[in-house]
Amino acid sequence: MEIEYENEYVHQVYDKIATHFSDTRYKPWPVVEKFLKSLPLGSVGVDIGCGNGKYQKVNPNVYMIGSDRCVKLVKIASNLGPMVISDGLHVPHPSNRFDFALSIAVIHHFSNENRRLQAVQEVLRPLVKGGKALFFVWALEQKNSRRGFSEDGPQDVYVPWILKRQYEYPNAKPEELKGHDPAENIAYQRYYHLFRKGELNELVETAGGSILEHGYDRDNWWVIAEKN
């Protein structure tokens, strides 16, 4: 049931919006950039749910393998470094081998608590003992949210992605796109679980991580954890 649901409201959506999504994702978030640049020279890690691979070149002194379920995003990211197509619950990496891991804006797309826990465990599994992982998830408590989220609202929501016409019809000629009413753009609904304050921390600790740092940034909760 959950697999079919996520396939419809997460995976199929990203397959359709991949190019448009990638074109809006190019600037590293400061917390992620700081984490990557703090890693020792020669560190080897994984970026699980890497999207278009925008973090691949942040620190040229580390080696990072990206993975994502979306084939189109992996093709885009493959120009930046080593990439694999992989589901977030079954990544093809050996256990206890990597120094660090990223999970940026991924866990909130899993549709129940057990699957979210499995996803966090799968981020920690490839790490050596003491390896570090950085997690980012959307927050329920979004200050001054333009999306209308609040701590009194529901945690499981749909968030629309308005696909611009040139991405819906990539082979159309420019003159064919002129005069288009933006109201006719297609809205694809993506599923999100909005995390309450402390919920990500509890999930990471249950999965076998120890919290080193945590905070709030850009409408997200984030955690840096060490594998026990």
UniProtKB/Swiss-Prot annotation:
Catalytic activity: 5-(carboxymethyl)uridine(34) in tRNA + S-adenosyl-L-methionine = 5-(2-methoxy-2-oxoethyl)uridine(34) in tRNA + S-adenosyl-L-homocysteine
GO terms under cellular component: cytoplasm; cytosol; nucleus
Entry's Gene Ontology molecular function annotations: S-adenosylmethionine-dependent methyltransferase activity; tRNA (5-carboxymethyluridine(34)-5-O)-methyltransferase activity; tRNA binding
SUPFAM superfamilies referenced in this protein's UniProt entry, alphabetically: S-adenosyl-L-methionine-dependent methyltransferases (SSF53335)
One Pfam family this sequence matches: Methyltransf_11
Gene Ontology biological-process annotations: tRNA methylation; tRNA wobble uridine modification
Annotated compartments: Cytoplasm; Nucleus
Residues in the signal sequence: none
UniProt keyword terms in alphabetical order: Cytoplasm, Methyltransferase, Nucleus, S-adenosyl-L-methionine, Transferase
Entry EC no(s): 2.1.1.229
Record-linked Gene3D superfamilies: Vaccinia Virus protein VP39
CDD domains, per the entry: AdoMet_MTases
Function: Required for the methylation of the wobble bases at position 34 in tRNA. Appears to have a role in stress-response.
UniProt protein name: tRNA (carboxymethyluridine(34)-5-O)-methyltransferase
Gene that specifies this protein: trm9
